[in-house]
Every structure is written in structure tokens, then in C-alpha cells.
């Protein structure tokens, strides 16, 4: 099927059956339809030669027909598919020639170019293929170039080498957004210098956006990793435009959280380049400039590993020399020097870590103290550290107590016996504008304590007197942060407390009283101050002055603080046995405005005074007042105490009005307890009817299901002192009270709770005996079931638990009536027969 054979009229390829198609071609020589029909017929019935003959004629007849050319070219390509391009080189060249003929008039058809280029990619024709790609790009409009570049990039990867680099360089002019793929190719091809340049270009381009979603930091990190790992293969210098040191240092300034990694990377770069001294300089710069311990640790560990590797290699070389018997003093000296340098590096580590923390916050007092401790006995460095700390720390921003640093600085000189220098330091310290008044007060106190340790007592007193200097009437607010600590320190309680203790221990009473008086003038006294001052005067037999101090303290403080002062004051006054009228006035003052919760102890003390030194009736009136004045929590106990005192002084009958008022004043639960005590008292007096009436009154507070103990006591009382009628009356009241509680919604929940508690208590008794447990379980009903039965019952009535028993007489012993199976058991049942009989 060569070109010459196809161009001449090969009449033998035209069969008799083709006449119809040939006549159609003759009648319509410019139409494509007859040719398509002819080709289709040959595809079904003709040989490959006949098909090629017809297609060749069609393309020559209609050279601008894209459809015919595409059909013909696909036919020829399919014929060669799977055949070796080298072995059948001539056939491949024929098809290449056909593509060239087609492109003469169809050079704007991208599909033809794609077919041609794909066909060329199967052949080992690199130069021809590259030139054909270039022709395609020139022939097609730029909107169609993406179709060509897709194949061109694949060709570039297969061609590799400089061909691939140059192809991609051209591609980047059109599609700079694919720079990452280009960089990957350059790295694969070992073109590291060019790859770094491309990294720098995209990082400098603010419009570049990664197609793979990488941030600028990720791209920059990839570039740095490439620079460090391929340091020897990458050309650097001004002529190339790559300055690795400047690149990494710019990243150190820009990416604060990656400084440790970048410093280590820069050092690794110089190590890879073989410049060990430069690497050591980088390590030193890194560990002395980073701001976090994490970065420091990363750099320091890399530094140590670097030094260990060098020392290890030098030791191996020394071992080899020793084996050979060679002596190299310079090499041995270098090894010793590096060993010494390594030891020094390890010794510096705590100081370097401390430097990092102080760079983070130079106002960190705690770290400055640690630095002082690191120097141990090196006095010169300790002084330098204290001096540097005082110069660096801003008192208003200090983290920790700045005053402690000053104090420790002074103590350092004190421990060395240089008190004069220590005093100079303290004198400067008390002028520092600390964050708080407390720090300044601590400094003054420490100064005085230093003088005390040196037994300069007068000097210590003078220092505290100077610290507490203030105007006669100071209007300064201790908590006013707008004022300096020096302006407010004279109102520091800590300072005055130390001052008064000091004066009390080393000075006279008069001087001590002056200090206490000054504290009261400044109105900074605390309750403890009042007590201490009063005790001091009492020890020196100034009892009246001591009482006046308590009174001044009571003017300063209100309840609840005043309660403790009154307690002490009244106790002291009573013990001194001052006039009864004066004591009464004091107690009345104490009780005036006293909160109820603090009233009970004062009333008891007041009543006891009247009992011992006054009149019993006065004491009773005080106790009666107390029952009204104390809090609700103390009222019951106060009534009990009042009743006990009244009974002991005036007999049991005198307690009746007290009981009556207590029952009226106390809440129901406590009133019930008081009723029981009242009834027991009447019973002991033989007043049975009065006791029964009290039980009847108390019954209104006691639900039989939740207060069974009350009803048991009443029942025992009736058994001992009553008769059948009084016992029936008790039972009637019990049923009526139970009915009252059944119709009161407020008690339904409490009944349920009480039943559950009752079940828990009776659970232990059930285990004692099976028979007794069975009876108890029948009597106990579920609380919710009882409520449901009550809801279904008519209002005011409770369904009977059993059928009629033939009167109110109980069955004979041993013949207990069994409940009817059809009647539900109801523990709330009320038997009305007794009421009817009573009528």
C-alpha cells in the first residue's frame, strides 16, 4: 500500500459489484455521501487493500473533508497497533506522511494533531516528535493548547533530561499555576538549583495559589528541606541568586514557632557543606536567641549530637594512630580541646535554659532567683545577677514578689557580714514602686528583722517608726491603686502588727500604748488588735482602760464581729464583779440590735448574772425575752431552758403558762414535743384530765401513719390512767385525725415517704420470723396504691378494709377473722361504729 501504488488507477481493485458506487461517485463528485457509502460497503465486503484504495481516492478527491481523513488515519493507525515501531519503521513513516498530507489543509483541527502526536509518541523519534508538538502549538489557537500540552507533558517526562526541563519551562509561561508539578519534575531530574529558583519565584508571587492546597509556609518548608538535604548539589552565591543563609534567617524572623527547627536546619546546611565552624556559630546563635524551651531543646540536642559525632570521629582517628604507633600532637590537642568545649557546653545548659525563660519574660522574679542559685558560691556572679535583675525588672510588671529579690540581695550581704551594704540595699528597696503595698510592707519588716538579728533593737524600732510615718489624720484609702505603695503603706495592718509586736517586746508600756492608740486613730485596727490591746492592759492591771478598749472596738465593728468582742467584754466584766447596774446596762447594749442567731449566748449569760447576783424573777423575765428574741433554730432549746429554770426556782406549776406559750409559738413538730413534755409534767402532778386534754390538743399535729410514737404514748397513758370511754375517745380522735390528713393534699407526699421509711425499718423485723413477717407485710400497703384507692373513693369516706364484723367487739383470741377474698385491704379504713354507739 505504498503511495505510488495508491495514486495510479489500480483498476483491478474495482470489482463488478462496485459499479453502482462508482456511478454514484461519477454523478456527484463533490459529495461525501457516496464516498461514505462506498467505504462502508468495502469495510463489510472488501479487503484491506480495497478499503485503503477507496479511502485514499476519497481523501484525494475531497482533501478538506475532516471526516474522511479521520476515518482513513484511524484505519491506518489501527492496522499498525501493537506492532514494533522499529521493526515496521517504513510502515510507520507512511502513516506519518499521511498525517502530514492531512495537516496541509486540516492544520486547525486539534483532533488530527492529537492523533498524530499520540502516534508519534509510539515511535523513537524524539526530535521529530518535539518539533511536531511545536508546530501543533503554533498552528492551533491558544484556547486549544491545553489538549496539546496534556500530551506534550507526558512526552517531556518520557524524554527526560534537558528536553523535559525546556518543555516545562515553556509550559510554565502559559500555566504558572502548575509550578508545583514543575518543581517535582526538577527534583526527580536532579535539577535542585532550578527547583529552588522556582520555589523562590512562587513564594515571591503574591498571586500564586497552590493547586494542592499548600500554604506558603508549607512551600517554604519544602524549599528549606531541599536546601538542607541537597546542600552540596545546589549552586549558591550572588551570581546564582540563592543565598541559603539569608533565606533561612528570613524564615527565622517570620515564623516564630519554627525557629528551633530552622536554626537546626541552617546548622545542618553548613555541616553538609563541610563548614563545621560556621555550623557551630549558628548553633551558638540559635541557643542564645530562641524564645521557647522547646526550640532551645531542639537546637541544643542537635548541637550536642554534632559535637559528639565530631569527637567520635576524632577518637576513632586517634585509636587508628595508636594502633599504628603514630603520634600527632596537634590532632590530640584538637581532640582534648573539643572534649573540653563539649563539657563546657553541657555545664552551660542550665544557664542557657534560664536565659531562654528570662528572654521570654525578663520580669520573672522566680527565674532570676533560680539564676542566683545556679551560681552557687560564685559571689561575683551572684552580685552581677542581682544587679542585672534589679535593672531588668519592671516593678509594676514583676511576676512573683519583687520584694523578695531585694530582701535576698540584702541578706546575701548580711550573711557576709556587710551590714552597711545591706542597709543601703534596703534603703533603696523601700523606695521601689512595688505592685502592692504588701510587698513594701514585707520589705520594711525584713529590714527591721535584720536589725533584730544583729541585736540592734533601737535601730529596728526606728526603722518601723519611719515606715509608719503618716499625717495625724490620714485620708488615704489603702485600696486606692492610683497612689503609690509608699503613700499607702502607713495603713498596712501587717506593718503595724509587726511594729506593735516589736515595741511590746523591746519597749515600755507607754510606748506600746502610743502605737496601739495610733492604730485606732488610723482606723485600721482588727478584732485581734482590740483583744491584744485589752489583754495587754489587763496584764498590767489597767482593768478600766481594758474595758474602754473593748468599747472602742465595739464602735469600730458591728455584728457578727461585735458578738465575739461582746462575749469577751462581758465575760471579763462579770469576772471583775463590777456593779450590777453597770453590768445590766452593758448586757442591754449588747442585746440592742443583736441578730437573733447570736442572741442566745448573751441572754444565757445575762440570765445567769441575774441568778447569781440579782433576782430570780429578773432572770425569768430575761429568759422570757430570750424566747422571743432568739432565732427559730434556738427557740425550742430556749423554751426548755426557761422551763427548767422556772421549775427549779418556782416549782412545776409555774411552768404551765410557759408550756402554753411555747406550744403556741413553736412550729407543729416542735409543738408536739413540747406537748408531750407538758402532758408528762401534768401526769406527774396527778392532773390526769389536764394531761389528757394536752394529748388531745397535740393530736392535731400527729398523723397516725407518720407519728406512730405519739399515739403509742397516748395509748399507754389511757391504759394506765383511763377507762373504756376515754380509750374509745382516743380511738375516735385518732380516726378523725387520720381522715383529716387523708383529705389534705399537703400530707400525701409525706405519707408516701413515711411509708417507705416504715418498710425499711420493718424489713429487719421481717427477717426475725417468717410468720411475724407475713403479718407485717399484709398490714403494709404500697403508698401509690393507697393513693389510687383514695382517688377512687367518694370524698370524705374511706373504703372499709373488711366486711361487717357484727358490732365493734373484737373476735375471740385465736379466732382472728380472715379478710374476705373479694374485699381489698385498706389500711386507711375508719370504723364508724364507735361514733354511732357514742351517739
UniProtKB/Swiss-Prot annotation:
Which coarse location class applies to the principal site listed for this UniProt protein? nucleus
Statement: the UniProt record of this protein carries the keyword Nucleus: yes
What is the annotated localization of this protein? Answer: Nucleus
Ranges annotated as biased composition (Acidic residues) = 830-839
- GO terms for biological process, alphabetical: generation of catalytic spliceosome for first transesterification step; mRNA splicing, via spliceosome
Record-level GO cellular component terms = post-mRNA release spliceosomal complex; Prp19 complex; U2-type catalytic step 2 spliceosome
- Bias type Basic and acidic residues, positions: 762-782
Keyword line: mRNA processing, mRNA splicing, Nucleus, Repeat, Spliceosome
Start and end residues of the HAT repeats are: 12-44, 46-78, 90-122, 124-158, 274-309, 377-415, 417-453, 470-502, 507-539, 541-575, 578-612, 650-684, 686-720
Q: Where is this region: Disordered?
A: 758-839
At the top level, the lineage of the source is: Eukaryota
Output the InterPro entries linked to this UniProt entry: HAT, HAT_Syf1-like_N, HAT_Syf1_central, HAT_Syf1_CNRKL1_C, Syf1-like, TPR-like_helical_dom_sf
Relate the protein's function as given in its record: Involved in pre-mRNA splicing and cell cycle progression.
List the PANTHER family hit by this protein, alphabetically. PRE-MRNA SPLICING FACTOR, PRE-MRNA-SPLICING FACTOR SYF1
- What family does the entry list? Belongs to the crooked-neck family.
Known partners and oligomeric status: Associated with the spliceosome.
The name this protein carries in UniProt is: Pre-mRNA-splicing factor syf1
Q: Which organism is it from?
A: Aspergillus fumigatus (strain ATCC MYA-4609 / CBS 101355 / FGSC A1100 / Af293) (Neosartorya fumigata)
Amino acid at each position: 500500500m505504498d503511495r505510488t501504488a495508491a495514486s495510479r488507477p489500480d483498476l483491478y481493485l474495482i470489482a463488478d459489484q462496485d459499479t453502482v458506487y462508482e456511478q454514484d461517485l461519477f454523478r456527484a463528485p463533490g459529495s461525501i455521501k457516496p464516498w461514505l457509502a462506498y467505504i462502508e460497503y468495502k469495510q463489510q465486503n472488501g479487503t484491506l487493500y480495497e478499503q485503503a484504495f477507496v479511502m485514499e481516492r476519497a481523501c484525494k478527491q475531497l482533501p478538506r473533508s475532516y471526516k474522511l481523513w479521520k476515518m482513513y488515519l484511524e484505519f491506518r493507525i489501527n492496522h499498525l497497533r501493537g506492532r514494533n515501531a522499529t521493526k515496521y519503521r517504513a510502515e510507520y513513516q507512511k502513516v506519518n506522511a499521511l498525517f502530514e498530507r492531512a495537516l496541509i489543509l486540516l492544520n486547525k483541527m486539534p483532533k488530527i494533531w492529537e492523533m498524530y502526536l499520540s502516534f508519534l509518541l509510539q515511535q523513537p523519534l524524539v526530535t521529530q516528535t518535539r518539533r511536531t508538538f511545536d508546530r501543533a502549538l503554533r498552528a492551533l489557537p491558544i484556547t486549544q493548547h491545553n489538549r496539546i500540552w496534556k500530551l506534550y507533558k507526558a512526552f517531556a517526562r518520557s524524554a527526560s533530561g534537558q528536553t523535559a526541563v525546556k518543555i516545562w519551562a515553556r509550559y510554565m509561561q502559559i500555566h504558572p499555576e502548575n509550578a508545583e508539578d514543575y518543581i517535582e519534575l526538577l527534583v526527580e531530574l536532579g535539577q535542585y538549583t532550578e527547583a529552588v529558583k522556582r520555589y523562590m519565584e512562587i513564594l515571591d508571587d503574591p498571586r500564586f495559589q497552590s493547586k494542592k492546597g499548600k500554604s506558603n509556609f508549607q512551600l517554604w518548608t519544602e524549599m528549606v528541606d531541599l536546601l538542607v538535604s541537597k546542600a552540596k548539589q545546589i549552586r549558591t552565591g550572588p551570581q546564582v541568586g540563592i543565598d541559603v543563609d539569608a533565606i533561612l534567617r528570613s524564615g527565622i524572623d517570620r515564623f516564630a514557632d519554627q525557629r528551633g527547627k530552622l536554626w537546626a536546619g541552617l546548622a545542618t546546611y553548613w555541616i553538609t557543606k563541610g563548614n563545621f565552624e560556621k555550623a557551630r556559630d549558628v548553633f551558638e546563635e540559635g541557643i542564645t536567641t530562641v524564645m521557647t524551651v522547646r526550640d532551645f531543646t531542639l537546637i541544643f540536642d542537635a548541637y550536642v549530637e554534632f559535637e559528639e559525632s565530631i569527637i567520635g570521629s576524632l577518637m576513632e582517628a586517634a585509636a587508628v594512630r595508636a594502633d599504628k604507633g603514630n603520634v600527632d600532637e596537634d590532632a590530640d590537642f584538637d581532640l582534648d580541646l573539643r572534649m573540653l568545649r563539649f563539657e563546657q557546653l553541657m555545664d552551660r545548659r542550665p544557664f542557657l535554659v534560664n536565659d531562654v525563660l528570662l528572654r521570654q519574660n525578663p520580669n520573672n522574679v522566680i527565674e532570676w532567683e533560680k539564676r542566683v542559685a545556679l551560681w552557687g558560691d560564685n559571689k561575683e556572679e551572684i552580685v552581677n545577677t542581682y544587679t542585672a535583675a534589679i535593672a531588668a525588672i519592671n516593678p509594676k510588671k514583676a511576676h512573683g514578689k519583687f520584694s523578695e529579690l531585694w530582701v535576698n540581695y540584702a541578706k546575701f550581704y548580711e550573711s557576709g557580714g556587710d551590714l552597711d551594704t545591706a542597709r543601703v540595699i534596703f534603703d533603696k528597696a523601700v523606695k521601689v514602686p512595688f505592685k502592692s503595698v504588701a510587698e513594701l510592707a514585707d520589705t520594711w519588716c525584713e529590714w527591721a528583722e535584720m536589725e533584730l538579728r544583729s541585736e540592734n533593737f533601737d535601730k529596728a524600732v526606728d526603722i518601723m517608726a519611719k515606715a509608719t510615718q503618716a499625717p495625724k489624720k490620714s485620708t488615704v484609702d489603702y485600696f486606692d491603686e492610683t497612689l503609690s505603695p509608699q503613700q499607702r503603706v502607713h495603713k498596712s495592718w501587717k506593718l503595724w502588727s509587726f511594729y506593735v509586736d516589736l515595741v511590746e517586746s523591746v519597749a515600755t508600756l507607754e510606748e506600746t500604748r502610743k502605737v496601739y492608740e495610733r492604730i485606732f486613730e488610723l482606723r485600721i485596727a482588727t478584732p485581734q488588735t482590740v483583744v491584744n490591746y485589752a489583754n495587754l492592759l489587763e496584764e498590767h492591771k489597767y482593768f478600766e482602760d481594758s474595758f474602754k478598749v473593748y468599747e472602742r472596738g465595739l464602735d469600730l465593728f458591728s455584728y457578727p464581729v461585735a458578738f465575739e468582742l461582746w462575749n469577751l467584754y462581758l465575760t471579763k466584766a462579770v469576772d471583775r464583779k463590777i456593779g450590777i447596774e453597770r453590768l445590766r446596762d452593758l448586757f442591754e447594749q449588747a442585746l440592742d440590735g443583736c441578730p437573733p442567731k447570736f442572741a442566745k449566748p448573751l441572754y444565757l449569760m445575762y440570765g445567769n448574772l441575774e441568778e447569781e447576783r440579782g433576782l430570780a424573777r429578773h432572770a425569768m423575765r430575761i429568759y422570757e425575752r430570750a424566747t422571743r428574741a432568739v432565732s427559730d433554730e434556738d427557740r425550742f432549746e430556749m423554751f426548755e431552758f426557761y422551763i427548767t429554770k422556772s421549775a427549779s426556782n418556782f416549782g412545776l406549776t409555774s411552768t404551765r403558762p410557759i408550756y402554753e406559750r411555747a406550744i403556741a409559738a413553736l412550729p407543729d413538730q416542735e409543738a408536739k414535743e413540747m406537748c408531750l413534755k407538758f402532758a408528762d409534767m401534768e401526769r406527774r402532778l396527778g392532773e390526769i384530765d389536764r394531761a389528757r386534754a394536752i394529748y388531745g390538743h397535740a393530736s392535731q399535729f400527729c398523723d397516725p401513719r407518720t407519728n406512730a410514737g405519739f399515739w403509742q404514748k397516748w395509748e399507754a397513758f389511757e391504759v394506765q390512767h383511763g377507762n373504756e370511754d376515754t380509750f374509745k375517745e382516743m380511738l375516735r380522735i385518732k380516726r378523725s385525725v387520720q381522715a383529716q390528713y387523708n383529705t389534705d393534699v399537703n400530707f400525701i407526699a409525706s405519707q408516701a415517704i413515711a411509708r417507705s421509711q416504715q418498710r425499711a425499718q420493718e424489713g429487719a423485723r421481717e427477717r426475725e420470723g417468717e410468720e411475724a413477717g407475713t403479718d407485717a407485710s399484709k398490714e403494709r400497703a404500697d403508698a401509690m396504691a393507697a393513693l389510687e384507692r383514695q382517688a377512687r373513693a367518694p370524698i370524705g369516706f374511706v373504703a372499709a378494709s373488711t366486711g361487717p364484723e357484727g358490732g365493734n367487739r373484737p373476735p375471740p383470741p385465736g379466732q382472728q377473722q380472715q379478710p374476705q377474698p373479694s374485699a381489698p385491704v385498706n389500711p386507711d379504713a375508719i370504723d364508724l361504729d364507735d361514733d354511732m354507739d357514742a351517739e
